[in-house]
Amino acid sequence: MSEMEVEKPDLTLYNTMTQLKEVYKPMNPGKIGIYVCGITAYDYSHIGHARAAVSFDLLYRYLRHLGYQVTYVRNFTDVDDKAKNCGEKPLDLSNRFCEEYLLDMAALQCLLPTHQPRVSDHMEQIIKMIEKIIENGCGYAVGGDVFFSVDKSPSYGQLSGQRLDHTQAGKRVAVDSRKRNPADFALRKAAKSGEPSWESPWGHGRPGWHIEFDIHGGGADLKFPHHENEIAQTCAACEDSGVNYWLHNGHVTNNNVKMGKSLNNFFTIRQIAANYHPLALRHFLMSAQYRSPLNYSVSQLESSSDALYSLSPYREEMSGDVGKTQQSAEAKEMIKKVKNALKFINVSISKLKKMQKKQRMSLVVSLVEVEKAVREVLDVLGLLTTLSYGELLKDMKQKALTRAGMGEEEVLQRIEERNMARKSKDFRRSDRIRELLAFKGIFLEDVPGDTVWRPSTPLTKPKSGLGLGMTAIVFAIVFTFLGFFFYSR
């Protein structure tokens, strides 16, 4: 093994095709190719789309962390018929929502894929592939449409576990009588009024939903028929499908019903981001094992927001006023907490003075390594923000005020009323004001000489304490997400 070929730790993935956890063996040592089905771009993306993006972004980050050279491809299906209902040119509509999707992905701190192909840019390759499928006897043209013959694919249904005689074609839509088998699917559709179309040997038309491109990923709902059809047509055009591992993330549900636009039971990424920091949404989307369903929950989003806040040191941006050096009460309290932590460390070290110098140095190195390890884990999880702490905390406070339906002036007024009650020893009123704010997700913290507030999970019933310590949050995140996506050994 050369110096450049560093041995990678084993990576174990659950393969939908075999329904087993398998040790990943790349086709080319040190290199991994991932293809993930992207969105059909005709509207703002919902949090179900976000879960797929975050799940595979986590895999992408982890593989790079392990030292693999990763080629990550996520497509845009920009060929659709929704534009005719919007009075907008089809490609203009899709281009607009491709860009909106990329803004959402940036907010969620999803890394840009290596390539982001659009269907409309690859019509020539698609036509050549269809011609190859027909040439191999696996496809047939009828009246400008081209269908794939599932009878020519002996393994059809293997990925999803669907038997060919149980695919229930026609259950949701009428069966096209021109098909040789009701389960046959369209490789290309003849042009219709108001829809985008391209010239081909079979006339003007557009590709069906199943012409796309190691690892193939997507949402669980794509297993059948989308991915099943991909396998069938790719095998028909090429000797080898080129996919060894199939990964599928679970649905996001609303009241335990799959979230989707057809049921109008969804929330867009933008809607959630209007009330919560996008990284709180990312944290929420990673809060369950990636193949399991994830039920939408305001309380869970609140908990994720609280965790994100607790991970951020309590630092405020310096004032722009020249010569102003006075520290805020919150900053002073944070310094006090840091000093207490340092005092604890100093006491601990003083007890170890009798140790040999080498042992003491080992302790210091260990502390540095712990901090480094935590940062590495948070980076792999995509939770290290590029914002300054001041910018992050300011944004999270503003969104907490939005959720509470309050302005900061109103919160400060309540704090002043509470301070007056405390001075007059009306502790019942003081506690009541604090509790009422806590019910709205505004947590008051008394620090020397002042009272400050921070976002928190809304209080649902009286209790003695609120929030989690930063240390507890860090370790909870580390141990929760180490088993989120992968198993390495």
Curated annotation (Swiss-Prot):
A motif ('HIGH' region) lies at residues 39-49. Belongs to the class-I aminoacyl-tRNA synthetase family. Gene3D superfamilies: Cysteine-tRNA ligase, C-terminal anti-codon recognition domain (1.20.120.1910), HUPs (3.40.50.620). GO terms for molecular function: ATP binding; cysteine-tRNA ligase activity; metal ion binding. This is Cysteine--tRNA ligase 1, cytoplasmic. InterPro entries: Cys-tRNA-ligase, Cys-tRNA/MSH_ligase, Rossmann-like_a/b/a_fold, tRNA-synt_1_cat_dom, tRNAsynth_Ia_anticodon-bd. It comes from Arabidopsis thaliana (Mouse-ear cress). Its cofactor is Zn(2+). One of its GO terms (biological process) is cysteinyl-tRNA aminoacylation. Zn(2+) binds at C37, H226, E230. It is an enzyme of class 6 (ligase). It is found in: Cytoplasm, Cytosol. It catalyses: tRNA(Cys) + L-cysteine + ATP = L-cysteinyl-tRNA(Cys) + AMP + diphosphate. HAMAP family: Cys_tRNA_synth (MF_00041). Its EC number is 6.1.1.16. The keyword Ligase applies. It comes from the Eukaryota. ATP binds at K261. The keyword ATP-binding applies. Binds 1 zinc ion per subunit. One of its GO terms (cellular component) is cytosol. It holds the Pfam family tRNA-synt_1e. PANTHER family: CYSTEINE--TRNA LIGASE 1, CYTOPLASMIC-RELATED, CYSTEINYL-TRNA SYNTHETASE. Keywords: Aminoacyl-tRNA synthetase, ATP-binding, Cytoplasm, Ligase, Metal-binding, Nucleotide-binding, Protein biosynthesis, Zinc. A motif ('KMSKS' region) lies at residues 258-262.
